[in-house]
Amino acid sequence: LDSEVVTCFDNSIAGSFERFTTTRDAVLISNNAVKGLSAIKLQYGLLNDLPVSTVGNKPVTWYIYVRKNGEYVEQIDSYYTQGRTFETFKPRSTMEEDFLSMDTTLFIQKYGLEDYGFEHVVFGDVSKTTIGGMHLLISQVRLAKMGLFSVQEFMNNSDSTLKSCCITYADDPSSKNVCTYMDILLDDFVTIIKSLDLNVVSKVVDVIVDCKAWKWMLWCENSHIKTFYPQLQSAEWNPGYSMPTLYKIQRMCLERCNLYNYGAQVKLPDGITTNVVKYTQLCQYLNTTTLCVPHKMRVLHLGAAGASGVAPGSTVLRRWLPDDAILVDNDLRDYVSDADFSVTGDCTSLYIEDKFDLLVSDLYDGSTKSIDGENTSKDGFFTYINGFIKEKLSLGGSVAIKITEFSWNKDLYELIQRFEYWTVFCTSVNTSSSEGFLIGINYLGPYCDKAIVDGNIMHANYIFWRNSTIMALSHNSVLDTPKFKCRCNNALIVNLKEKELNEMVIGLLRKGKLLIRNNGKLLNFGNHFVNTP
């Protein structure tokens, strides 16, 4: 067999164990223990995709043995998740049955859990807007049966140890709360917390679950547990992926974009659309940059209209921006918007008299994909965007402009390199398409002293990055919103002439501390007023 092949053997078939012992990389599944070898021991199985813990009157026990590189793998002591879901959950011990049926106080007294914060950690605190505790599946099952909320799982990988779900309160259908949890047997969880050192204020604890160390955060007060929860795994909660510097300095030839997950869809919680997630993740990324956010920030949003005659992107931007920010949006189609000013019509005829601090563009021309021949730079609305950046974007301002494999512009790639920082950002919810946002932070214009790479080469570098990088498809970050709001960083607005731009001023531009534009009233949108504060 190929050395990279892992062979699975069933010990109930004669001769399987002997073949397992001579195979380089293999797994042996047995319902009997093999003397002298350490195993992963599971006390449940799956029958027609449903978890079962007994067959007839006999308990189900599986022993799993592993060989790697011709050697037996010694298994560490571990707790194991139970493979249940919210819909298929059934208690597997007397303690779990008591948890679902007994009063909270009586249960805690019966099992001696007074010092372990069970009221918060396991029973769950739903008295506040943000859900507290409930980090075991059985916690959600108990409260959902009481009619307090509904639960919707949203992790794609069903075999994940740490899962997440979206919880909606029954008395507030518009609410969305995220809850991370594991399906550990309650008896095992009690063993875990009773083994903790409570003489600390805070501590990161490694808990071995499914043969892997998971970090849990422990907080105590007066030798009592206040909270104990699994830390989020950053990769699954990443709002997206930014193009690394290494790919920006390549000199690739343009190839077709060939994504491994092209066209795949991610299941979204009820009431949340892809555009809402996309814009939320874009805003979350912009929060990590040196974006200038002055008082009365000016923002222009192009391509605002969605398929339903509304502007979901503007709604997200309005929620993200400081309350005193001025949001202007535009689209070719009629639409309803949360922007302060909306202009309907072709963006190329949109006359801008004043300078803006942030440009967000979701413009896309579907006809670019059907053009025969080579995939070359497109003009169209990109000509307007390039002119806007050169003439109407504040020095120190920023942009986020959508591109795709076929919808791109050579001059825009070269212009974006005149920002202090630039990248291409792909939102996690849209990694199954070639779409990305060209991000430019802190515009320097003619004061940029960096070498400019040809735009055709840079687009080829982008496609090469997309083809060579596996990106997880996820919307998880949209539910992690405590720090979503964009906060004013008191960036200064000054109106300076070219001869007044010395090294100190340019240094402030680079650091996102300064914007250069007029600071008077925003003009020429009076005929398109939509919302009154």
From Swiss-Prot:
It comes from the Viruses. The active site is at residues 120, 135, 176, 278, 362, 402, 435. GO terms for molecular function: endonuclease activity; mRNA (nucleoside-2'-O-)-methyltransferase activity; RNA nuclease activity. Residues 90-230 form the NendoU domain. Residues 234-530 form the Nidovirus-type SAM-dependent 2'-O-MTase domain. GO terms for biological process: methylation; viral translational frameshifting. The record marks 233-234 as: Cleavage. The keyword Signal does not apply. Gene3D superfamilies: 3.40.50.11580, Vaccinia Virus protein VP39 (3.40.50.150). Keywords: Endonuclease, Hydrolase, Methyltransferase, Nuclease, Transferase. Residues 1-73 form the AV-Nsp11N/CoV-Nsp15M domain. The keyword Transferase applies. Its EC number is 3.1.-.-, 2.1.1.-. Pfam families: CoV_Methyltr_2 (PF06460), CoV_NSP15_C (PF19215), CoV_NSP15_M (PF19216). The replicase polyprotein of coronaviruses is a multifunctional protein: it contains the activities necessary for the transcription of negative stranded RNA, leader RNA, subgenomic mRNAs and progeny virion RNA as well as proteinases responsible for the cleavage of the polyprotein into functional products. This is Replicase polyprotein 1ab. It comes from Porcine transmissible gastroenteritis coronavirus (strain FS772/70). The gene is rep.
